[in-house]
């Protein structure tokens, strides 16, 4: 996971390498670093996706990673959710919850990389939740989502992330890597 600011944008990245263990963690970390550095250098999203995809395709292992990116325009409040094989994200606005999902494949899975982009105009107080598949498995009806929607998790981003992780680990049969990132919009 990375967050960074570049000129007029704030970025949040969550990459989740396919599989488990050290190799998957390394693929995730390398992909996030590629995205961060290339975007910071001014490369277009398409160029960065193509570069990371080519890099992963040319590794000796079958490497691929999901990409869940939030690109928030600091000038106009528009937020692009860019997804490649990523789990659904949530936007919490007051008592409303919006799910942003994708059917695209992970980066490094095929020769051509495809992504889906959803643009949302955010408001102060909105919260964005990005999660990995270790948390999202069976998102509908999951205990952490029920706890979140019933208001039984702490409202601050750090507390909410900790509560989601704790609830997601409850009753887990086989541990999978689990990542959650909660962002709150303070002003637009």
Feature names for model-found ranges:
Residues 1-10, 64-67, 99-141, 173:
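Acidic loop->beta-strand submotif enriched in PP2C/PPM serine/threonine phosphatases
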Residues 6-8, 74-76, 188:
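Short strand-connecting beta-turns/loops that link adjacent beta-strands
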């Amino acid at each position: 996971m990375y967050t960074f600011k570049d000129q007029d944008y704030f970025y949040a990245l969550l990459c989740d390498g396919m599989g488990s263990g050290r190799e998957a963690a390394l693929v995730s970390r390398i992909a996030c670093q590629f995205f961060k550095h290339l975007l910071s250098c001014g490369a277009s999203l398409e160029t960065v996706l193509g570069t990371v995809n080519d890099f992963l395709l040319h590794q000796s292992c079958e490497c691929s990673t999901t990409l869940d990116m939030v690109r928030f325009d600091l000038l106009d409040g528009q937020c692009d959710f860019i997804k490649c094989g990523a789990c659904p994200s949530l936007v919490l606005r007051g008592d409303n919850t919006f799910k942003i999902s994708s059917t695209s494949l992970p980066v490094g899975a095929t020769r051509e990389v495809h992504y889906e982009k959803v643009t949302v105009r955010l408001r102060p107080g909105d919260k964005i939740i990005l999660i990995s598949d270790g948390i999202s498995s069976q998102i509908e009806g999951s205990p952490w989502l029920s706890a979140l929607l019933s208001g039984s998790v702490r409202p601050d981003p750090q507390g909410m992330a900790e509560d989601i992780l704790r609830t997601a680990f409850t009753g887990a049969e086989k541990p999978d890597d689990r990542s959650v990132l909660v962002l709150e919009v303070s002003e637009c």
